[in-house]
């Protein structure tokens, strides 16, 4: 009997092993040969129809058919509000940047907690979910076919009876009336339609989902442009023109996968860092970076690599010129790729996107402005209506500037207050032009987070309607914030803050100095948050460059020049920075002349004036060899105690 049981057990074990081996073999073959095949079916673009009968008034007018605007309109409509969704650009599909701009690869906000069991077979977990997740579940993946995306957006809008859609209008002008003090209140929108006729539509609420906050600017909302808030008023992130190649079969896609140093999934590929060697025909205005490749369902790919410098997003003539030089360069870039990479050899150039990918223009000032500290410390907010985790990716601002990965956050909150602009009531701003400082905007600008903002804005219209309160009044109330968050959770958003450990840099003794330095764009941490080098030695030459950055940010406070401190110094790049030298250079930058403050007197002067704290001095281990962290702490103290600016 025992022998029989052993035989049965052995047979069962053998069968199990055979089945598992077969399953593993099948999985191996599938993973190697079929997992990355594109089995999706291409679909023609649906014809977008505008409403024929505009109403005299709506609960809310949403300006802009980028994803943020679509989400805002859907959210408001599903909450029972009558919505007019209106587009002032010449577009024939919904989706804006993702469709007309050809940006078919998403910058995603991944949750800190991801599925562990069979993770390679499961979809990643994203922050916020809600309407973004509803749309994402219907597209192909991390990249998508632009027709699919546009059609899904249109079907979602068309399915809501509370939404009227009006495309291709010639002009949108917000109508306002004077309210308290220097504040105005939205009363409606003047719309010049495609046929040239003008109508005035009444509303008490407008959601500005235009890429550049055009409605907010026209209504009188204050804003900064580009990197103006860090003392660089002429710079903004580079623009891109996405271009298309055809002939990308499953076999070609497999070759992308085999390319060393390239990452590939079913719909996206990224890498080709050495493509930067491309010699531009217009080197003052165009270069390329590594390739971001998004696959489509008709054997085409869209490539985000071209960087076009000198485009002013707020000047239509400049934008037109940017498109022209980009379209001239695109075929040349394709020729370069075909000659240098075998997998590109058989592909054909198939044109460019209809619009530029503009990363940065206006940043409005709202009831709260998202700061680098918010992102760096992964802060939550009592009125958070969405969460981000995308890298602070600051793209090039000039041909000689390669751009910066400031850091990789884990999960930070975007307050509702950042959607509520100063000076104008009845208005919300969503998307990359919301109330974000330029550095954290490098993370907060991504579309999925903008869609969370749009969903919150749409729900806020209903909340304001119920309580007969303005958006500004909502933004001051923790009770209303709790109501809004509950509404959003009830309609499918995930506003949970996940469990995670804060990054190591926050435990460093010089963290406050690091935060100040990073906020002034003096340092960066890269993708792994390990590039700060706080314990590495600082030299006089590099310290001088940090002081010049400080002076650029606060030109009225720091009118002197620290250059003279290095005038007779040899090897300023290799010599260690001493505490006396640092203090002397700080005094010179503040405007003190050599006759007033000498090298020997500078430190005592700063201490006497309480411009440097005792704790900072105690934290310096070697006063003859300052570290980066030591130097950042000195700068941080002077900026706080002399300029009155705190970055905490």
Residue ranges and their predicted role:
Residues 29-33, 49-51, 57, 75, ...:
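Conserved N-terminal/central alpha/beta ligand/cofactor-binding core
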Residues 521-542, 549, 553-648:
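Terminal recognition/anchoring or ligand-binding modules at protein termini
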Residues 56-58, 195-205:
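Core beta-strand elements of the Rossmann-like FAD/NAD(P) dinucleotide-binding domain
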Residues 175-200:
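Conserved beta-strand-loop-beta-strand element in the redox core of flavoprotein oxidoreductases
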Residues 2-60, 151:
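Extreme N-terminal leader/targeting segments of oxidoreductases
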Residues 200-216:
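Short hydrophobic core segments
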Residues 63-67:
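Glycine-rich Rossmann-fold phosphate-binding loop(s) that bind the pyrophosphate
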Residues 11, 24-40, 50, 97, ...:
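Flavin (FAD/FMN)-binding glycine-rich loop and adjacent Rossmann-like elements that form
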């Amino acid at each position: 009997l025992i022998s029989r049981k052993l035989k049965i057990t052995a047979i069962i074990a053998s069968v199990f092993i055979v089945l598992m081996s077969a399953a593993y073999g099948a999985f191996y073959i599938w993973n190697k040969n079929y997992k990355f095949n594109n089995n999706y079916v291409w679909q023609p673009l649906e014809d977008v129809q505008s409403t024929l009968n505009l109403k005299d008034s709506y609960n809310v007018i949403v300006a802009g058919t980028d994803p943020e605007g679509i989400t805002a309109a859907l959210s408001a409509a599903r909450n029972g509000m009558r919505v007019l969704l209106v587009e002032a650009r010449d577009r024939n599909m919904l989706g804006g940047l993702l469709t007309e701009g050809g940006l078919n690869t998403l910058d995603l906000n991944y949750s800190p907690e991801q599925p562990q069991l069979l993770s390679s077979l499961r979809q990643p977990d994203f922050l916020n979910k809600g309407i973004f997740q509803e749309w994402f579940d219907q597209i192909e993946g991390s990249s998508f076919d632009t027709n699919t995306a546009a059609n899904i957006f249109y079907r979602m809008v068309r399915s809501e009876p509370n939404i009227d859609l009006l495309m291709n209008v010639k002009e949108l002008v917000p109508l306002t009336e004077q309210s308290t003090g220097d504040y105005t209140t939205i009363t409606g929108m003047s719309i010049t339609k495609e046929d040239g006729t003008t109508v005035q539509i009444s509303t008490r609420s407008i959601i500005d989902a235009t890429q550049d906050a055009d409605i907010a600017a026209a209504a009188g909302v204050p804003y900064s442009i580009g990197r103006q808030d860090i003392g660089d008023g002429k710079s903004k992130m580079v623009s891109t023109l996405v271009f298309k190649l055809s002939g990308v079969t499953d076999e070609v896609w497999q070759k992308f996968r085999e390319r060393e140093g390239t990452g590939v999934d079913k719909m996206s590929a990224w890498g080709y860092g050495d493509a930067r060697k491309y010699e531009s025909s217009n080197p003052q205005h165009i270069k390329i970076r590594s390739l971001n490749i998004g696959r489509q369902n008709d054997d085409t790919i869209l490539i985000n690599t071209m960087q076009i410098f000198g485009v002013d997003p707020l000047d239509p003539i400049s934008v037109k010129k940017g498109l022209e030089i980009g379209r001239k360069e695109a075929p040349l870039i394709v020729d370069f790729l075909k000659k240098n990479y075998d997998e590109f050899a058989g592909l054909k150039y198939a044109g460019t996107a209809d619009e530029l990918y503009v990363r940065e223009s206006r940043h409005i000032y709202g009831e709260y402005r998202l700061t680098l500290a918010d992102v760096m410390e992964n802060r939550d907010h009592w009125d958070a209506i969405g969460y981000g985790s995308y890298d602070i990716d600051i793209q090039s601002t000039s041909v000689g500037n390669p751009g910066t990965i400031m850091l990789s956050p884990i999960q930070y909150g975007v307050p509702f207050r950042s959607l509520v602009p100063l000076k104008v009531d009845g208005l919300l701003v969503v998307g990359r032009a919301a109330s974000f400082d330029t550095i954290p905007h490098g993370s907060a600008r991504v579309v999925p987070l903008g869609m969370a903002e749009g969903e919150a804005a749409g729900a806020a219209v209903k909340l304001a309607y119920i309580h007969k309160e303005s958006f500004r009044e909502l933004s001051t109330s923790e009770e209303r914030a709790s109501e809004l968050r509950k509404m959003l959770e009830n309609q499918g958003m995930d506003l949970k803050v996940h469990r995670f450990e804060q990054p190591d840099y926050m435990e460093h003794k010089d963290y406050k100095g690091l935060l100040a330095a990073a906020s002034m764009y003096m340092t960066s941490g890269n993708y792994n948050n390990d590039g700060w080098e706080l314990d590495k030695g600082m030299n006089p030459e590099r310290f001088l460059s940090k002081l010049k950055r400080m002076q650029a940010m606060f030109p009225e406070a720091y009118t002197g020049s620290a250059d003279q401190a290095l005038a007779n110094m040899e090897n300023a790049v290799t010599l260690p920075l001493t505490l006396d030298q640092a203090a002397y250079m700080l005094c010179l930058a503040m405007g003190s002349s050599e006759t007033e403050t000498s090298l020997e007197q500078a430190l005592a002067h700063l201490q006497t004036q309480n411009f440097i704290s005792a704790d900072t001095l105690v934290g310096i281990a070697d006063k003859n060899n300052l570290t980066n962290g030591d130097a950042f702490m000195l700068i941080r103290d002077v900026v706080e105690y002399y300029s009155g600016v705190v970055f905490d």
